[in-house]
């Protein structure tokens, strides 16, 4: 299911929400209406949490069905709250805290920014239980902000090179396409939230953009 919605007037959904096929980490002050739409569209358990005392869960965490890697500034109580809900979360040993902006992942693999250290790459691979490859996307280091990936497909920044697209397809084990959201915005990961069940995008996303998103993320099959 694909839905157009803003979070308290903000279309940058991927900055605030980190999602897998089973769980969504959303800000503690998320309105009930938005929470209901997310729960229905993505078919997930919703956890209202903070990371590093912040509402920027999408920027500060990346996960798949095996767990989440979070900012090294995440607090013990936040890690414990996730553990109590049955969600493993491990801090990344890295000075760059916005791990959600730097990693594109699904249950098959992870593509990580060249900015990340070998130790960070090891933790990502161990926690998510996937192979990790290093690449830019659209020539930029913020791989997670430049794309959205699920176990069904990936939507990438239109400036992605054929080499970058090939790396992402090989690593994540899905077909990828390029497109935009929110009427021409190329920061796909920062402006959308997607899993294998559905996708949320900002209210300004156009009809042609929706069609491309549905196709790229595998919602037009069969």
Swiss-Prot record:
This is Translation initiation factor 6. Belongs to the eIF-6 family. The gene is eif6. Pfam families: eIF-6 (PF01912). Binds to the 50S ribosomal subunit and prevents its association with the 30S ribosomal subunit to form the 70S initiation complex. GO terms for biological process: cytosolic ribosome assembly. SMART domains: eIF6. One of its GO terms (molecular function) is ribosome binding.
């Amino acid at each position: 299911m694909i839905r157009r919605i803003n979070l308290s007037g903000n279309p940058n959904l991927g900055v605030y929400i980190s999602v897998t096929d089973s769980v969504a980490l959303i800000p503690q002050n998320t309105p009930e209406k938005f929470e209901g739409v997310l729960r229905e569209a993505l078919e997930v358990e919703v956890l209202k949490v903070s990371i590093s005392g912040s509402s920027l869960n999408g920027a500060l965490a990346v996960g798949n069905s095996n767990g989440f890697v979070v900012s090294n500034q995440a607090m013990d109580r936040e890690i414990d709250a996730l553990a109590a809900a049955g969600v493993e979360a491990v801090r990344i040993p890295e000075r760059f805290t916005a791990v959600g902006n730097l990693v594109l992942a699904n249950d098959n693999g992870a593509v990580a920014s060249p900015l990340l250290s070998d130790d960070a790459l090891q933790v990502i691979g161990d926690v998510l239980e996937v192979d990790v490859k290093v690449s830019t996307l659209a020539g930029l280091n913020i791989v997670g902000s430049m794309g959205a990936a699920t176990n069904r497909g990936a939507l990438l920044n239109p400036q992605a090179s054929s080499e970058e697209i090939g790396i992402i397809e090989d690593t994540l084990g899905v077909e990828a396409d390029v497109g935009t959201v929110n009427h021409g915005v190329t920061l796909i990961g920062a402006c959308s939230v997607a899993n294998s069940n559905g996708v949320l995008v900002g209210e300004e996303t156009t009809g042609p953009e929706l069609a491309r998103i549905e196709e790229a993320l595998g919602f037009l099959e069969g």
